[in-house]
């Protein structure tokens, strides 16, 4: 099992606690992935971080549930062997009460290929008490 998936390991999203140490998955994004109905992400950045963790853990159910219905694909297929290497949140902008943007860089590596960076500015909307990923522009 990869270290990022071990119980007690730091959250794959890389968020740091007040002590400057990585938060455990259960105290960070795990609470959103494992209790979707009862614990919605409080802001667009938290949702984006939890969606990154859902990619790391191949949680298509969470990714689809947090994708806005206007843009949601019918299914998600994960590329076999992809290793997610890290996430850097560059900016979180609250545009108004129901719209936000998050700029981030996620790194991944596929078997037999060099590592790649996904640089995206994602758009989010808040509806019915939840944040949803709408779409994004890659750079």
From Swiss-Prot:
Pfam families: YchJ_M-like (PF17775). It comes from the Bacteria. InterPro entries: NTF2-like_dom_sf (IPR032710), UPF0225 (IPR023006), YchJ-like_M (IPR048469). Belongs to the UPF0225 family. This is UPF0225 protein Bpro_4182. It comes from Polaromonas sp. (strain JS666 / ATCC BAA-500).
């Amino acid at each position: 099992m990869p270290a990022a998936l071990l119980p007690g390991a730091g959250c794959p999203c890389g968020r740091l606690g007040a002590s400057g140490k990585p938060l455990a998955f259960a105290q960070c994004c795990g609470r959103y992935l494992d209790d979707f109905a009862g614990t919605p992400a409080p802001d667009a950045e938290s949702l984006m971080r939890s969606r990154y963790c859902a990619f790391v853990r191949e949680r298509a159910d969470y990714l689809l549930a947090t994708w806005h219905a206007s843009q949601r694909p019918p299914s998600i297929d994960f590329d076999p062997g992809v290793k997610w290497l890290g996430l850097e949140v560059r900016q979180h902008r609250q545009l108004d009460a129901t719209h936000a943007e998050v700029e981030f860089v996620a790194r991944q590596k596929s078997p037999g290929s060099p590592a790649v960076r996904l640089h995206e500015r994602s758009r989010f909307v808040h509806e019915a008490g939840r944040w949803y990923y709408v779409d994004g522009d890659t750079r």
